[in-house]
């Protein structure tokens, strides 16, 4: 009908105007797949890369990762650095919390000899360093840990108890305006780690909020909510955390997806466990009783042994990873989150959980 055609033309013109004014990806159809033309860096978790829809975090954009204490925020960003360094990219870590552990970073695969690190005195100094690194065009990934620790100079120089209403929010707002364009031009990924605070007097709805005002929420292309949802035990000893990440905002693909994976203490994200779980889900790995097989060859009895096989055979792990990415990303396949419920018989057969 003519009316429908006119509406379509008007809609197309409106969408074009919005994208021209606010940038590509500011509006899209929920089921639309426009993510493959965006350069990304892996998060170190296959299921999270798939949930993001583009295979990782987008270059040239601002990303916010927030969650409660000890939920895996810094671990996730260190895994991003390790993945970027494997691709030959230059990374920087702005340690505003003064809490970065180089030994732990090295265990996660970070090349600490080639990682730029700064421990700024004030929030303004941290953000100026970010801007200088971005404008150089030579740094590919910058991590700021964390927004809550970016203390304005006036607050540091003042007395404890002085009121500095909205100072940090104004500082972040100004920095976002300055950084957003430079990041796009330099194709630099900037990740802000943030903490959670509680709003006072909220009776209905979610009382949680993040620090630093609203500017970061608006300028971030991706916002990830990371939570610890359980413990992983070997006997009575806790050896890791079950982790869930929700993609609460996504400008490069459809938002609101989530991923579950395991973070092993001292090792990081259990990527091989994800390969086994997703491989079984999508029938790339056969499971008969306790035995796992790949391409007709047995790779281990129990999930722990199957993971060890993939660790000892990185070529097979890479092949399986590529097949899963091709299926779940490039063909628009749907991620089925691997959960412990599907592998209850594994828990009965072995005390080792991954």
Curated annotation (Swiss-Prot):
GO terms for biological process: DNA recombination; DNA repair; SOS response. GO terms for cellular component: cytosol. GO terms for molecular function: ATP binding; ATP hydrolysis activity; ATP-dependent DNA damage sensor activity; damaged DNA binding; single-stranded DNA binding. The keyword Cytoplasm applies. It comes from the Bacteria. ATP binds at residues 67-74. PROSITE patterns: RECA_1, RECA_2, RECA_3. Keywords: ATP-binding, Cytoplasm, DNA damage, DNA recombination, DNA repair, DNA-binding, Nucleotide-binding, SOS response. It holds the Pfam family RecA. It is found in: Cytoplasm. Its main location: cytoplasm. Can catalyze the hydrolysis of ATP in the presence of single-stranded DNA, the ATP-dependent uptake of single-stranded DNA by duplex DNA, and the ATP-dependent hybridization of homologous single-stranded DNAs. It interacts with LexA causing its activation and leading to its autocatalytic cleavage. Belongs to the RecA family. This is Protein RecA. It comes from Serratia marcescens.
């Amino acid at each position: 009908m003519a009316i429908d055609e006119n509406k379509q033309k008007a809609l197309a013109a409106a969408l074009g105007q919005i994208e021209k004014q606010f940038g590509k990806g500011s509006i899209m159809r929920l089921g639309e797949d426009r993510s493959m033309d965006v350069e990304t860096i892996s998060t170190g978790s296959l299921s999270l890369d798939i949930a993001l829809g583009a295979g990782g975090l987008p270059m040239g954009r601002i990303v916010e990762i927030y969650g409660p204490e000890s939920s895996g925020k810094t671990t996730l960003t260190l895994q991003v650095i390790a993945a970027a360094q494997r691709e030959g990219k230059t990374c920087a870590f702005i340690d505003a919390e003064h809490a970065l552990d180089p030994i732990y970073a090295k265990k996660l695969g970070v090349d600490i000899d080639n990682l730029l690190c700064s421990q700024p005195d004030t929030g303004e100094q941290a953000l100026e360093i970010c801007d200088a690194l971005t404008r150089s065009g030579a740094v590919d990934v910058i991590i700021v840990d964390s927004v809550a620790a970016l203390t304005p100079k006036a607050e540091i120089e003042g007395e404890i108890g002085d009121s500095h209403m909205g100072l940090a929010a104004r500082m972040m707002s100004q920095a976002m305006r300055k950084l957003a364009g430079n990041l796009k031009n330099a194709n630099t990924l900037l990740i802000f780690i943030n903490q959670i605070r509680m709003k006072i007097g909220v009776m209905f709805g979610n009382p949680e909020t993040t620090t630093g005002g609203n500017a970061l929420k608006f300028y971030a292309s991706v916002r990830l909510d990371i939570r610890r949802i359980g413990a992983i035990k070997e006997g009575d000893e806790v050896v890791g955390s079950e982790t869930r990440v929700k993609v609460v905002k996504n400008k490069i693909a459809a938002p609101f997806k989530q991923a579950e994976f395991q973070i092993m203490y001292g090792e990081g994200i259990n990527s091989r466990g994800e390969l086994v779980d997703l491989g079984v889900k999508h029938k790339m790995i056969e499971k008969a009783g306790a035995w796992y097989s790949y391409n007709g060859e047995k790779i281990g009895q129990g999930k722990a042994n199957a993971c060890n096989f993939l660790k000892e055979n990185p070529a097979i792990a890479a092949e399986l990873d590529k097949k899963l990415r091709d299926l779940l990303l490039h063909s628009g396949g749907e991620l089925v989150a691997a959960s412990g419920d599907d592998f209850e018989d594994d828990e009965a057969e072995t005390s080792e959980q991954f």
